[in-house]
From Swiss-Prot:
GO terms for biological process: tRNA wobble position uridine thiolation. The record marks 128, 344 as: Interaction with tRNA. This is tRNA-specific 2-thiouridylase MnmA. Keywords: ATP-binding, Cytoplasm, Disulfide bond, Nucleotide-binding, RNA-binding, Transferase, tRNA processing, tRNA-binding. Catalyzes the 2-thiolation of uridine at the wobble position (U34) of tRNA, leading to the formation of s(2)U34. It comes from the Bacteria. NCBIfam families: PRK00143.1 (NF001138), trmU (TIGR00420). Signal peptide: none annotated. One of its GO terms (cellular component) is cytoplasm. It catalyses: S-sulfanyl-L-cysteinyl-[protein] + uridine(34) in tRNA + AH2 + ATP = 2-thiouridine(34) in tRNA + L-cysteinyl-[protein] + A + AMP + diphosphate + H(+). It is found in: Cytoplasm. The gene is mnmA. Belongs to the MnmA/TRMU family.
């Protein structure tokens, strides 16, 4: 039997059930485990209670229960500089960012990893639903989590080979109900705690209110692609490509009652374009361009790739051809795709292996750029 007692694993503990069970499993496997709570955002709810304080109490209770030391580390400045400023800049540019991708890249597997090294860590572990496999030569591959509903490789797609070398995902082979079962059997205080949802720094707050407290909203015209005036929008940043509803327009007199969708944005003219029908022509595209393209393995500067891709979390994979040039790529779809959204991640897969990904810049219909500018 392997003696893990000399291998130190520092676990990122959020106060949720997933990271609690991660720490428990590693402790049971004999590792030298330390728990660390990351405070990334100064947050108080409507009653003036800091939700991070409550989460830290749960971390402390779980750590005491399973018998591991624990620390708290403050990454508020790093989070603001590396994740939140990016989030605001993307919305300013009329895009729809994915802060979770950036948080994993910059905070959980960079700032936290660096901190863990000061504690003498051999590895860091988190409660993400993903798996890693290690080749004989030490190369690490990232694989989808066994629970298809929970697989989080989409959000981990910007991790480098160097980061993956130091990572463990103990929940990767488990289904979520089994994780709760383990927590309940061990009597962990977090066993029945509900999963957190949404963007971590917004929490349960109204998204519109939150965004408008940081970025001024500018109202403007709402139009169809063929130029019909449809009234006024409340600010382009509040709308995302493919969004249904929230525009204040229902069935039009003398027209059909098909639902309305956001089909485009013109930032320079401050116009929101809308259209009827889920598969409205303006929502369909045949390719995209991406930047900040990155692979988990060391790859040449220029190459082509035939693989599958996801353009948003929890969507089925689609077959694509990828032409990579440095940190940029053109991604050509086998079948037209709906509502490709600038700012979101495009993530590449070969079977169950997550190869990497990038951030979507623009979508195209044949050679023509879609109206997402």
């Amino acid at each position: 039997m392997t003696d893990n007692s000399k291998t130190r694993v520092v676990v990122g503990m959020s106060g949720g059930v997933d990271s609690s069970v991660t720490a428990l499993l590693l402790k049971e496997q004999g590792y030298d485990v330390i728990g660390v709570f990351m405070k990334n955002w100064d947050d108080t709810d409507e009653f003036g209670v800091c939700t991070a304080t409550e989460d830290y109490k749960d971390v402390a209770a779980v750590a005491d229960q399973i018998g591991i030391p624990y620390y708290s580390v403050n990454f508020e400045k790093e989070y603001w500089d590396r994740v939140f400023e990016y989030f605001l800049a993307e919305y300013r540019a009329g895009r729809t960012p994915n802060p979770d991708v950036m948080c994993n890249k910059e905070i959980k597997f960079k700032a936290f990893l660096d901190y863990a090294m000061t504690l003498g860590a051999d590895y860091v572990a988190t409660g993400h639903y993903a798996q890693v496999s290690r080749d004989a030569d030490g190369t690490v591959h990232m694989l989808r989590g066994a629970d298809n509903n929970k697989d989080q490789t989409y959000f981990l797609s910007q991790l480098s080979q160097e980061q993956l070398q130091k990572v463990m995902f103990p929940l990767g082979h488990l289904q979520k109900p089994r994780v709760r079962e383990i927590a309940e059997k061990a009597g962990l205080v977090t066993a029945k705690k509900k999963d957190s949802t949404g963007i971590c720094f917004i929490g349960e707050k109204n998204f519109k209110e939150f965004l408008s407290s940081y970025l001024p909203a500018q109202k403007g015209r709402m139009m169809t692609i063929d130029g019909r005036d449809m009234g006024e929008h409340n600010g382009l940043m509040y709308y995302t490509i493919g969004q249904r509803g929230g525009m204040g327009i229902g069935g039009q007199k003398g027209g059909d009652n098909a639902p309305w969708f956001v089909v485009g944005k013109d930032l320079s003219q401050n116009i929101l374009y809308v259209g009827q029908g889920f598969y409205h022509d303006a929502l369909m595209s045949t390719s995209l361009t991406a930047s900040q393209v990155h692979f988990t393995q060391n790859m040449p500067d220029k190459f082509t790739l035939n693989c599958t891709a996801k353009f948003r979390y929890r969507q089925p994979d689609s077959k694509v051809d990828v032409k990579v040039n440095g940190d940029k790529a053109e991604v050509i779809f086998d079948e037209p795709q709906r509502a490709i959204t600038p700012g979101q991640a495009v993530v590449f897969y070969d079977g169950d292996e997550c190869l990497g990904g990038g951030l979507i810049d623009n979508a195209y219909q044949e050679e023509k750029i879609c109206q997402y500018i």
